Amino acid sequence: MSRCEDNLVEFYRFFSQALIRHGYTAKKRVGELFAFLKPFEYGHFIFSFIAYEATGLIRVRPPQASFDAVEKILQEIDYPDKLQFSISLGTFMGELSEDMDKLQKRMEASPTVESASLLGLETFRYIEQKLESFEEEYSIPGNIIEELEYRDFWAMAFNGSPPEAMFRGLIFYQLASPELLPDKLHQSDRVFESRELVADDAWRISYQVLKEKLPRWKAYSTDVSAHSFTVPSRFHSAFSLKAIWAYLKKLYSNEVKAI
């Protein structure tokens, strides 16, 4: 076997059964990318990793929660630098543990069978100890909306480049809590009207198309809509648009490096 195959076997053997126990029974592979999917009411959770054939390096990706309706609608909108659909990308992304990050860096420095084994063991621990809490956090739209309203800026939670994250967020609000959407549109209007923040006019055109289409999509259910939730986003007073945009760009840059 090649070094990549040796590392992959040693890495995967530690947690293959754990994924099955936790419901990640659907498997998909595209080239060097391996993804395991678990369905929930509004979409599916994704756990994935990449095994680089040339070097033997294995990189674990943070878990993802894909809201299928959101992702389907987003695919219908054309916008600049649109990435090809990926089986490993969802609407929201979790975080890996500090121990996993350390072992990931060790693997990157020395992609050996030993480092693959240690990373596989820590991946098993992560699945057993952390994955369920991630699923609970991102399985109910109403709970997500409530959490978003306490954040410094709601779009920070969504995957993608800063403008794409806002697109995802607006679609999600339309489906999950449309009564809160006007406030989010007011904020996003300010972003896309600013040439300092969004230089490409193509984004403004795509944004107008999205705004026109948003009312066509009906909410998931009034049961998950946060009708009684009135705490406003702190975005208005605590943070400047420029500071938020810089943060989102940095966040997206880190995500791209991890792919």
Over which residues does each language-model region extend?
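Short secondary-structure junctions
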Residues: 20-29
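Intrinsically disordered, low-complexity regulatory regions enriched in serine/threonine/proline
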Residues: 2-12, 28-259
